[in-house]
Every structure is written in C-alpha cells, then in structure tokens.
C-alpha cells in the first residue's frame, strides 16, 4: 500500500506543468520504499506556474535538483499589465488636467465677473445671465447628444427645487459681495464654509462632529475675523453677502442628502447639476425683474457710456467660466473622495485669492495676509480631519 501511494504521488507530481524556477528538494525513503514520517514534498511557485520534482525512486535517500532558466511572464499577461499601467497614467493625467482647468476657469470667472460688476452692480441681473448661459449650454449638450437627457419625475423636481433656490440665492449673494468688496476678501470670508457645514449637518442630519473637527473651526473663524478687521475694502454689505452665500450653499449641500436620499442615483452628476442650473435660472427671472428690472437692454447700456461690445463679451466669458468650473467640480468629485475634493477646493481658493490680488493689484497688509493664511490653514486642517469623522448619514 505504501509503494502504491508513493507511486501515485510521483505520477501526479510528474504531470504538473514545468515553470521557470529552480527547486531543490530532499525526500528520505525507508527500506521498504515508504516515505519517512515528517519528510515533505516541496513545491515552489515562480512566474505564475507550479514546478514539481521528478520521480523519486530507488529505495534510498535521493536528492533531486531541477534547474530552469528564468522565463518572462506570458505575452498576454505582460501586455495586460502594461495596458493597465498606461490606463492608470492616462487617468491620473486626465484628472490633473481637469483640476488645472477647474482652477483656471475659477480664476477667469472671478476676474471677468468683477470687471462686469464694477460698472454694473446688479447681482440679480448678472446671476440670471450666468444661469441663462449655463442653461443654453446644457440644452445644446442634450440636443447634440453629447450627454443623454434625463428622465425626471415631478416628485424629483419638487425635491430638487429647494436646492435650486439655495443654489440661485447663493450665487446672487456671492455676486453681491463681489460687487462691494475685493475678490480676495470675498473668498477669504467664503473660507468659513466648514463652520456652516458643521452647524447645518448637526441641525438637519443629526451628525455630531468630533472634538478635532470642532477645533479646526477655531483658526477658520479667527482667521476670517482677523482678515476682516484689517481689510481695506471692508464693507458690511459685502461681508454679510458672502456669509449669506456660505449659509445658502451649505444648506443646499446638506439638504441634498436629506431630501434626495437615494433618489439622486436616478440622475448622474452631470444631469443633476444640469437640472439644478435650469431650475435656478427659472427661479432667478422673477427675482431679477422684481428687484432690478431689465438692466441688460441695449438702450440702458448705451446710456451708461460703457463699451457695449466689450461688456457683453466679458459677461459671456464670465457665464461660460461660471458654468464650466461648476460642472468640472461635479466631475472631479465623481472621480475622487470627498476629502480629496475638499483639499483641492481649499488649494483652489488660495490660487484664486493670490491671482486676484496680483491682477487687480489689491493692497493687502501683513496682518490681513496672516488672517487669510490662518483661515485657509484651518480649512485645510478641517478637510484632513473629515477623513476620521464618523459617517452618521
């Protein structure tokens, strides 16, 4: 029986596929041909293949060596690995290009928007124009079948409508702030968004922030306060408008979790943003007409003595950049984690502040710069600490 078992094992081992490896093994046999207790049949794996020992026989201790030259991976496996590596590099390069474009569009939006708002301080009209431009691009995208148009129910529209109202009003108050104070100061105030996120998440979603997250809000609030006290262009309307923008934008984000729940899965990120933009435009029209009337008529613009063609070109470019950077923000968020997106958004705010200071030659004191830096540092810390924040929603 022992000889039969040994012969059976040897036959099975000899039929195994030979791979590219070197295997050294020893097996001791007893005088009767049985395997001595404790002796092992070694097996190595190299290059993804099994390598077995040749048949051992003779009724005595045998030492076998099998030598084989190292062989490369099969051609199909090597090509697949190379393809995956090229694909990963291409995805990384594409993501990097999207982030750079996101930053550039944000910079140019703030520059063109400020250039339009300085001679025409009509935030409701400018907001309606920007949302109208975005809606036109969206319908063009659907008409050309660049992206499939969504199928949306009345119940979904009813749930998205409050979010659209928050989105529209947040944009109105941002434009109102930009028309009153420097671009750099508006974005310094808007760095306090995490404070409103924590407050609204606790109130509406029942999320309890950790002590570390609460601690990260201290430099944010302190930095914004320090920058506000030393801001040369300080204006109360500009300050409270930026604060109201923070409250409305973060209310939109928090309520989207509460109102939409799992139903947003029926809409992809692009179509959800598209519906949000179109509804925001429709809601902005009556507000614009009631608050400011029709300010973009050719007769009114000529009466101001402004260069009509130049003003319209800048307004159109601001609308294009506004829609472009917001859509890119959604697309980037779909590719990375929320924490990574928050950090990238923090860096984006730094880039916008620096670019606006350089372009508009905004005077800034050392204490003001310190306050801005402390606030942005707090935002970065908050973004990193969100990684450890428990998910209660």
From Swiss-Prot:
Record GO terms (molecular function): phosphoenolpyruvate:phosphate antiporter activity; triose-phosphate transmembrane transporter activity; triose-phosphate:phosphate antiporter activity
Keyword annotations: Chloroplast, Membrane, Plastid, Pyruvate, Sugar transport, Transit peptide, Transmembrane, Transmembrane helix, Transport
Superkingdom, taxonomy of origin: Eukaryota
Coiled coil: none
Keyword check for Chloroplast: yes
Protein's UniProt keywords contain Membrane: yes
Family matches, as SUPFAM superfamilies: Multidrug resistance efflux transporter EmrE (SSF103481)
InterPro entries per the UniProt record, alphabetical: Sugar_P_trans_dom (IPR004853), Tpt_PEP_transl (IPR004696), TPT_transporter (IPR050186)
A cellular-component GO term for this protein: chloroplast membrane
Pfam families linked to this entry: TPT
Bilayer-spanning residue ranges: 89-109, 124-144, 164-183, 195-217, 232-249, 270-290, 362-382
Subcellular localization, as worded in the UniProt entry: Plastid, Chloroplast membrane
Function: Phosphoenolpyruvate/phosphate translocator that transports phosphoenolpyruvate (PEP) and dihydroxyacetone phosphate.
Name of the protein in question: Phosphoenolpyruvate/phosphate translocator 3, chloroplastic
Species this protein is from: Oryza sativa subsp. japonica (Rice)
